C-alpha cells in the first residue's frame, strides 16, 4: 500500500496534525474563528510591512518624506500603506474579540495557552506602538515622547532607563532607528510565540461553548472548519479592503499629516483607538507612578484571570449573573475607550476614574464573588 505523504512526511505531518486531521469539537461557533483570523492578520501585516520597509528610510530628516514618496511614486504604495495601517486596527479588533471569547467561555483554564496569549497581546501592543512612531508625524513624535517618558516614573532607575531607550536626552534619530529595528523584529517574535500558543492549545484541544470535555464527539478540522474559516477570512479581508480603499484615514489622527516638530505640542496627545482604554486608565490617576502601575495592571490583570475562577462551571453559557457582569465589563471598556479620546476636563475626568475603578472591581472582586454565588444558587 502506498504511503500517505501527508501523514508520514516529517514536515507535512506537523501541518496535517494542526490544520487537516486535527480533532475539533463539533459544536464550536463562529467565535472560534478569530484565532485563524489573527494568523491571517499577522501574515498580511508581515507581507505589507516588508514591502513598506523596502521603501522606508529610518532617519528623522527623511522618514516623513519617504512615506509621502511611497504613497505618491511607488506602484500601489498608497494601497500597501493603507492596508498596513488599517490592518493593525483589524488585528486589534480580532485579538480583543478573541480574548473576550476566551474570557466568556472559560478558555483561560488552559493556563499555558492563556498565558502565552497574554504575552502575545503585550508583544503586539509593543509592535503597534513602535510602528506608530515610524511615519514621524506630530502624533508619532509626541506619542513616543509621552509613552517612553512614563518609564521615568520607575524609582531610582527611571531616568537612566528612559535616556537609554531614547539613545539621548530626547526622542531623536537614534530613537527612530531603534524603533524601526524593533518594529521589523517583533512580528517574527509574534509568529514564533504563535507556534508556542498553538502547541500548548493542541496539547489539550479546543474548548467549546458548553465548557465540557468533547473527546467523545470530535470531527476533523478539514473540511468542516477550514471551509468555515474561509468565510471569516473573506469577511475580514473585504472589511479591510473597504476600510483601506474608502476611508483609509478614518481611524488615524489628522495631526500625523504634519511632520514631527519638537517645538510645537499638539493640543490633544492621544494614541490610536486600540490603546485608548489603557490610556484612559493611565490618565485617571493623578500621580505619575500610580498611573503607570494602573496602565500596566490594566493588561497584566489578564494573567490573574485563571486564578480568580471560582465557578464549578467552565463556561458562562449557563451562568446568567456572570453574563450580566461580562457585558457590563464590555460596556465599561467601550466607555474607557471613548473617555481616552476626550480632553482632560470635567466631566471626562470623573467618568474615566469611575470606569477605571469599575474595570478592576469587576475583574478582581465581582467575578470571583458571583462565581461562588452561582455555585451556591445552583447547589453545585
Swiss-Prot record:
Binds 2 heme b groups non-covalently. A ubiquinone binds at residue 202. The keyword Repeat does not apply. It holds the Pfam family Cytochrome_B. Its cofactor is heme b. GO terms for biological process: mitochondrial electron transport, ubiquinol to cytochrome c. Heme b b566 binds at residues 98, 197. Keywords: Electron transport, Heme, Iron, Membrane, Metal-binding, Mitochondrion, Mitochondrion inner membrane, Respiratory chain, Transmembrane, Transmembrane helix, Transport, Ubiquinone. One of its GO terms (molecular function) is ubiquinol-cytochrome-c reductase activity. The keyword Transmembrane applies. Heme b b562 binds at residues 84, 183. It is a multi-pass membrane protein. PROSITE patterns: CYTB_CTER (PS51003), CYTB_NTER (PS51002). InterPro entries: Cyt_b/b6_C, Cyt_b/b6_C_sf, Cyt_b/b6_N, Cytb/b6-like_sf, Cytochrome_b, Cytochrome_b_C_euk/bac, Cytochrome_b_N_euk/bac, Di-haem_cyt_TM. GO terms for cellular component: mitochondrial inner membrane; respiratory chain complex III. Its main location: mitochondrion. It is found in: Mitochondrion inner membrane. It comes from the Eukaryota. Heme 1 (or BL or b562) is low-potential and absorbs at about 562 nm, and heme 2 (or BH or b566) is high-potential and absorbs at about 566 nm. The cytochrome bc1 complex contains 11 subunits: 3 respiratory subunits (MT-CYB, CYC1 and UQCRFS1), 2 core proteins (UQCRC1 and UQCRC2) and 6 low-molecular weight proteins (UQCRH/QCR6, UQCRB/QCR7, UQCRQ/QCR8, UQCR10/QCR9, UQCR11/QCR10 and a cleavage product of UQCRFS1). This cytochrome bc1 complex then forms a dimer. Belongs to the cytochrome b family. Component of the ubiquinol-cytochrome c reductase complex (complex III or cytochrome b-c1 complex) that is part of the mitochondrial respiratory chain. The b-c1 complex mediates electron transfer from ubiquinol to cytochrome c. Contributes to the generation of a proton gradient across the mitochondrial membrane that is then used for ATP synthesis. This is Cytochrome b. It comes from Paradisaea minor (Lesser bird of paradise).
Amino acid at each position: 500500500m502506498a504511503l500517505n505523504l501527508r501523514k508520514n512526511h516529517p514536515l507535512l505531518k506537523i501541518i496535517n496534525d494542526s490544520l487537516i486531521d486535527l480533532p475539533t469539537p463539533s459544536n464550536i461557533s463562529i467565535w472560534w474563528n478569530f484565532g485563524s483570523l489573527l494568523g491571517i492578520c499577522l501574515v498580511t501585516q508581515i507581507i505589507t510591512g516588508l514591502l513598506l520597509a523596502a521603501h522606508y528610510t529610518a532617519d528623522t530628516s527623511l522618514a516623513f518624506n519617504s512615506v509621502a514618496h511611497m504613497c505618491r511614486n511607488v506602484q500601489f504604495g498608497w494601497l500597501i500603506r493603507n492596508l498596513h495601517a488599517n490592518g493593525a486596527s483589524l488585528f486589534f479588533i480580532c485579538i480583543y474579540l478573541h480574548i473576550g471569547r476566551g474570557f466568556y467561555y472559560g478558555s483561560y483554564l488552559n493556563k499555558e495557552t492563556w498565558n502565552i496569549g497574554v504575552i502575545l497581546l503585550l508583544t503586539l501592543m509593543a509592535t503597534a506602538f513602535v510602528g506608530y512612531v515610524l511615519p514621524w508625524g506630530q502624533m508619532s513624535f509626541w506619542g513616543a515622547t509621552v509613552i517612553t517618558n512614563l518609564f521615568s516614573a520607575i524609582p531610582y532607575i527611571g531616568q537612566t532607563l528612559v535616556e537609554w531607550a531614547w539613545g539621548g536626552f530626547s526622542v531623536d534619530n537614534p530613537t527612530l532607528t531603534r524603533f524601526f529595528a524593533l518594529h521589523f523584529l517583533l512580528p517574527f517574535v509574534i509568529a514564533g510565540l504563535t507556534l508556542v500558543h498553538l502547541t500548548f492549545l493542541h496539547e489539550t484541544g479546543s474548548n467549546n461553548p458548553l465548557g465540557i470535555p468533547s473527546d467523545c464527539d470530535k470531527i476533523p478540522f478539514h473540511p468542516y472548519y477550514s471551509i468555515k474559516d474561509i468565510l471569516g477570512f473573506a469577511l475580514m479581508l473585504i472589511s479591510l479592503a473597504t476600510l483601506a480603499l474608502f476611508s483609509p484615514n478614518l481611524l488615524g489622527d489628522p495631526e500625523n499629516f504634519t511632520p514631527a516638530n519638537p517645538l510645537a505640542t499638539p493640543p490633544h496627545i492621544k494614541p490610536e483607538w486600540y490603546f485608548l482604554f489603557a490610556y484612559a486608565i493611565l490618565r485617571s490617576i493623578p500621580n505619575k507612578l500610580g498611573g503607570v502601575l494602573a496602565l500596566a495592571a490594566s493588561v497584566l490583570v489578564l494573567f490573574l484571570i485563571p486564578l480568580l475562577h471560582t465557578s464549578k462551571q467552565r463556561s458562562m453559557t449557563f451562568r446568567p449573573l456572570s453574563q450580566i457582569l461580562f457585558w457590563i465589563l464590555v460596556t465599561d471598556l467601550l466607555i474607557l475607550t471613548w473617555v481616552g479620546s476626550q480632553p482632560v476636563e470635567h466631566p471626562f475626568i470623573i467618568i474615566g476614574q469611575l470606569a477605571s475603578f469599575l474595570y478592576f472591581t469587576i475583574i478582581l472582586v465581582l467575578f470571583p464573588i458571583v462565581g461562588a454565588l452561582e455555585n451556591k444558587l445552583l447547589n453545585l
